[in-house]
């Protein structure tokens, strides 16, 4: 991917003025030059151009707030005066793995008054026996060269690395180069996932309740069936008893009628 295209993607619908950090590592610099980077990036504090195939920084725009510049693993051999002209706030510069052969190529860096840390690992200039003493003498403002101070004491991390960009939102509502809208979207996604989990739990609870109700319903039906059977059985018994009672009543009535007839016959005999 070429550098222009990469910058366009990194903007993510932001304005250049809203960008504080820009990482363009491993993209392709056409003709070995910087492309697509303009002086509209007025608030840029960190720029990384590692292994992009740069031969020169002659097209670097003015970036008044840039503090850290990563240019390692390129093919830069000179033209560092451009850095002194366009980067007045630069504190950390990494030129490791470039084609810097002579101490004289570093002289333009004397004008970078804020420069505290310089890295030249893998550059041919480091092969000089008096390399460190010469560079510290040439650049008295330096605190650390290749991660060590003048007394060969290793630099603390806070000095080697640029402090993280403060997380205060800018005028566009962005934090650390990330759109506030993107953070909101992530929050919404998390809430949706929580809601889905809650709904699943509710569904499970409802299913359990339905199962319990079904079981209770079956028990009630069993009880009702038992009562009906018992009631039905009792009903049959009652009907049989009623039939027996009716038979007895009929027998009694017939017996009574027979006695009455007998008495009437006896009475007639007496009259005769």
Swiss-Prot record:
The modification Phosphoserine is found at residues 164, 171. Residues 255-265 have a biased composition (Basic and acidic residues). Disruption phenotype: Deficient mice display a highly penetrant perinatal lethality in a mixed genetic background and a fully penetrant lethality in a pure C57BL/6 background. Mutants also show enhanced clinical symptoms correlated with depletion of naive effector T-cells, exhaustion of lymphocytes and enhanced prevalence of follicular T-helper cells. In addition, mice show significantly reduced H3N2 or H5N1 influenza viral loads, inflammatory cytokine response and reduced pathogenicity compared to WT. LRR repeats lie at residues 18-38, 43-64, 65-87, 89-110. The keyword Plastid does not apply. InterPro entries: AN32, Leu-rich_rpt, LRR_dom_sf, U2A'_phosphoprotein32A_C. Residues 123-161 form the LRRCT domain. Residues 149-272 are annotated as: Disordered. GO terms for cellular component: cytoplasm; nucleolus; nucleoplasm; nucleus. A motif (Nuclear localization signal) lies at residues 260-263. One of its GO terms (biological process) is roof of mouth development. Pfam families: LRR_9. Residues 149-254 have a biased composition (Acidic residues). Keywords: Chaperone, Leucine-rich repeat, Nucleus, Phosphoprotein, Repeat. One of its GO terms (molecular function) is histone binding. Some glutamate residues are glycylated by TTLL8. This modification occurs exclusively on glutamate residues and results in a glycine chain on the gamma-carboxyl group. Directly cleaved by caspase-3/CASP3. The modification Phosphothreonine is found at residue 265. Its main location: nucleus. It is found in: Nucleus. Multifunctional protein that is involved in the regulation of many processes including cell proliferation, apoptosis, cell cycle progression or transcription. Regulates the proliferation of neuronal stem cells, differentiation of leukemic cells and progression from G1 to S phase of the cell cycle. As negative regulator of caspase-3-dependent apoptosis, may act as an antagonist of ANP32A in regulating tissue homeostasis. Exhibits histone chaperone properties, able to recruit histones to certain promoters, thus regulating the transcription of specific genes. Interacts with histones H3 and H4. Interacts with KLF5; this interaction induces promoter region-specific histone incorporation and inhibition of histone acetylation by ANP32B. Belongs to the ANP32 family. Histone binding is mediated by the concave surface of the LRR region. This is Acidic leucine-rich nuclear phosphoprotein 32 family member B. It comes from Mus musculus.
